[in-house]
Amino acid sequence: MKLYRSILAVALMATALTAWCQDDIKNTEFNPVTTGVTSLNITPDARGASMGDLGAATEADANSQFWNPSKYAFAYSRAGVSLSYTPWLRKIVNDIYLANLAGYYKIGSNDNQAVSASLRYFSLGEVTATDGDGATLSVINPFEMAVDLGYSRKLSEKFSMGVALRYILSDLGANTMNVNESSSASAFAADLSGYYTTFPVIGRNECQWSLGFNVSNIGSKVSYNGGNDPAYLPANLRLGTAFTFPLADYNNLTISLDANKMLVPAKPRLEDFDGDNMAYEDALQVWKDKSSISGIFDSFSDNFAKRITYSIGAEYAYNQQFFVRGGYYYESKYAGNRQYFGMGAGFSLNVIKIDASYMIATAQNSPLDQTLRFTLSFDMDGIKGLLGRD
């Protein structure tokens, strides 16, 4: 048995970044992009998930490292920390989860800069390795993790930019089958982001309109066999806008929209070459040899419109203490067929904020259906205030 192929298959299933394929979707209508370390694109926090997986232009919070690090420069609190937990694919297994720790600290004159960091850990649960006869060889616990460091700065009163550097490690467990193969792979990546916000007055109400972008996971490829079969990182372009307006005293409503495009070229398929195996093998080799940067440019020529995913969501806030959220995520059948609603709520009291979200998939038998997320956040300014410190 090829142990690592089996584990890789588990990893692809576990991250569930493509939908549960329906029988009525023809091969010509279903061609999702495949990458390595796909857990990097799983939404870590409950707030973003409850609005349909968006956050490029929403108000900054401790989890902005994933959505748009440049937002930290506009954060109202000087510092914040957040811990999120997501049980993953609980309809199928009960030991796969994503844990995420993120935080930031404002620096510089007038707090116009921020440093940030995050640690995400994706556990693939417990996997039993067997030989060809079905005998147990070992029990392993594969995982994927990433550590980020970020920096953001206001370039004007309305615009900021940010960068993040990331170290990625994917460990598929102990190698029990082939001493010439490695069980782990690592890579480095970077994000580049920007955020613009302004406060237009409509009637007698001061509103807030924001725009944001984040180009994430631009970096080296990952490989478990010495570079013979490298995989692209899940590079992604996220564009978003958000508009907040007051409904009444202490009542605000935010409407947000995000659009995403994977910056990875689709893997060639044999059916696209009318059975010409030689042409297919040549195209596959070109795809494997292509650099990550070249792949980014080529990704825009591959059914561009069909590969854009959309998220639309809303957040109602009462006195910045009670929050109700909802949203919808859409991906075409061609790109993966993930379509689902998100909903959630949050409660903030002094220094602590608690958020929860729930996913309802519209596709039948989707493993993403009923996904729960929980986030616990701490306002460090509030903690200092309670302690009576400046």
Walk through the language-model features, giving the residues of each:
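Bacterial N-terminal signal peptides that target proteins for export
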Residues: 1-8
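Subset of outer-membrane beta-barrel
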Residues: 22-390
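Acidic, glycine-enriched active-site microenvironments
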Residues: 13
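Surface-exposed charge patches in extracellular/virion surface proteins
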Residues: 4, 20-21
